[in-house]
Amino acid sequence: MPEVSAKGTTISKKGFKKAVTKTQKKEGRKRKRCRKESYSIYIYKVLKQVHPDTGISSKAMSIMNSFVTDIFERIAGEASRLAHYNKRSTITSREIQTAVRLLLPGELAKHAVSEGTKAVTKYTSSK
């Protein structure tokens, strides 16, 4: 008696066996892992700069990664809004700086702005 395939067509037993073995061979191959982006290597580098003898647990790293992602999204969103308000199509360092000033409180904003300015200056001088 002919077998019914997954598509609903009838095929002979010999053809059915061939179809089954082909799908089994495909399953045997290793699938490429889906790459998950994170800031963990950069967080680790900063940790070693600040406290060279201190380690970090995977749970703490996960929390720090979520924190960095959240702050990045907030700054990007605010900078985008500022560019839209001023009828600009480009987010520049000025929009980022203003977004940081709006989002972060007092002294933290001042430090973030000074570090950002320093990083931009270093980048432009190396070009």
From Swiss-Prot:
What are the N6-succinyllysine sites (modified residues) in this protein?
K36, K118, K122
List the InterPro entries: Histone-fold, Histone_H2A/H2B/H3, Histone_H2B, HISTONE_H2B_site
Q: Which residues carry this modification: Dimethylated arginine?
A: R81
SMART domains reported for this sequence? H2B (SM00427)
Instruction: Give residues for the crosslink Glycyl lysine isopeptide (Lys-Gly) (interchain with G-Cter in SUMO2).
Output: K7, K22
Q: Keyword Secreted on this protein?
A: no
Q: Which domain of life is it from?
A: Eukaryota
Query: In the record, which positions carry N6-lactoyllysine?
Result: K7, K13, K17, K18, K22, K25, K45, K87, K110, K118, K122
Q: Name one GO molecular function term.
A: histone binding
Phosphothreonine PTM sites in chain numbering: T117
Residues modified as N6,N6,N6-trimethyllysine are K87
- List cystine links: none
Places the protein is found: Nucleus; Chromosome
Q: Which PROSITE patterns does the UniProt record give?
A: HISTONE_H2B (PS00357)
- Location of region: Disordered: 1-32
Q: How is it modified after translation?
A: Monoubiquitination at Lys-36 by the MSL1/MSL2 dimer is required for histone H3 'Lys-4' (H3K4me) and 'Lys-79' (H3K79me) methylation and transcription activation at specific gene loci, such as HOXA9 and MEIS1 loci. Similarly, monoubiquitination of Lys-122 (H2BK120Ub) by the RNF20/40 complex gives a specific tag for epigenetic transcriptional activation and is also prerequisite for histone H3 'Lys-4' and 'Lys-79' methylation. It also functions cooperatively with the FACT dimer to stimulate elongation by RNA polymerase II.
Which terms are listed as keywords in the entry?
A: Acetylation, Chromosome, DNA-binding, Isopeptide bond, Methylation, Nucleosome core, Nucleus, Phosphoprotein, Ubl conjugation
Which Gene3D superfamilies does UniProt cross-reference here?
Histone, subunit A
Keyword field contains Phosphoprotein: yes
Subunit composition? The nucleosome is a histone octamer containing two molecules each of H2A, H2B, H3 and H4 assembled in one H3-H4 heterotetramer and two H2A-H2B heterodimers.
Function recorded in the entry: Variant histone specifically required to direct the transformation of dissociating nucleosomes to protamine in male germ cells. Entirely replaces classical histone H2B prior nucleosome to protamine transition and probably acts as a nucleosome dissociating factor that creates a more dynamic chromatin, facilitating the large-scale exchange of histones. Core component of nucleosome. Nucleosomes wrap and compact DNA into chromatin, limiting DNA accessibility to the cellular machineries which require DNA as a template.
For this protein, the record's PANTHER family field holds: HISTONE H2B
Protein's recorded name: Histone H2B type 1-A
Species this protein is from: Rattus norvegicus (Rat)
Instruction: Quote the gene name from the UniProt entry.
Output: H2bc1
